[in-house]
A protein has these predicted regions:
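Glycine-rich phosphate/diphosphate-binding loop of Rossmann-like nucleotide-binding domains
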Residues: 1-10, 90-178
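Phosphate/diphosphate ligand-binding glycine-rich loop within oxidoreductases
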Residues: 2-89
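Active-site-proximal flexible loops/turns
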Residues: 56, 112, 185
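Glycine/threonine-rich flexible loop motifs
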Residues: 179-186
Length: 186
């Protein structure tokens, strides 16, 4: 999607689909800093999709060109949420004041980015996800991780949590659904 967007804007793309095809791969283990210092000579921006949470943030600290986070492991996926916000804006003609319900696995990076994005608007959001199940020992806790909830509170996001969509769906203006699965971000 990032490549297609650049071509639609009249730009060109130089890239690689796998870090193993670069000096950051298995043999050399080049650092993010060294990789970015090399990449910044190839273009005017870097779109980084990385398996490591926080890698684009680290890359931005070293780069002399803008770094766009195209998804980072279990961390964030802001470009996806920007696309979702744009779709809502096209369909609803506004974002402020809409009541959001986010359903699924809150460990997913898009849910984290949704929370951060909604801090910029007057939008209450309810995160709906299952907690650990006593009937199935070892089942994952899919609720929003504490580190993100702390950030959302610090940024004054109006949010709450629920375990069942039936509790909140009647009040929703926008529903964002993520699968309840174990993604492989490697």
């Amino acid at each position: 999607a990032h490549e297609a967007a650049m071509h639609r804007l009249g730009g060109h793309v130089t890239g690689f689909s796998d870090a193993k095809m670069t000096r950051a791969g298995d043999w050399y283990q080049e650092s993010i800093k060294d990789t970015v210092k090399m990449l910044e000579f190839y273009g005017d921006a870097i779109v980084m999709r990385h398996f490591q949470k926080g890698a684009p943030h680290e890359a931005a600290m070293w780069a002399s060109v803008p770094v766009i986070n195209g998804g980072d492991g279990w961390g964030e996926h802001p470009t996806q949420i920007l696309t979702d916000l744009y779709t809502v804006l096209q369909q609803k003609h506004r974002i402020d004041g809409l009541r959001w319900v986010a359903v699924g696995d809150m460990r997913m990076r898009t849910m984290h980015s949704l929370g951060y994005a909604l801090t910029q608007f007057d939008c209450p959001v309810t995160f709906v996800s299952p907690g650990p199940d006593d009937l199935f020992p070892g089942s994952p806790d899919m609720r929003m991780p504490e580190e993100y909830k702390a950030d959302f509170q610090r940024y004054s996001l109006d949010f709450k949590e629920a375990e069942h969509v039936e509790q909140v769906i009647a009040d929703a203006d926008v529903i964002l659904v993520e699968p309840v699965i174990q993604p492989d971000y490697t």
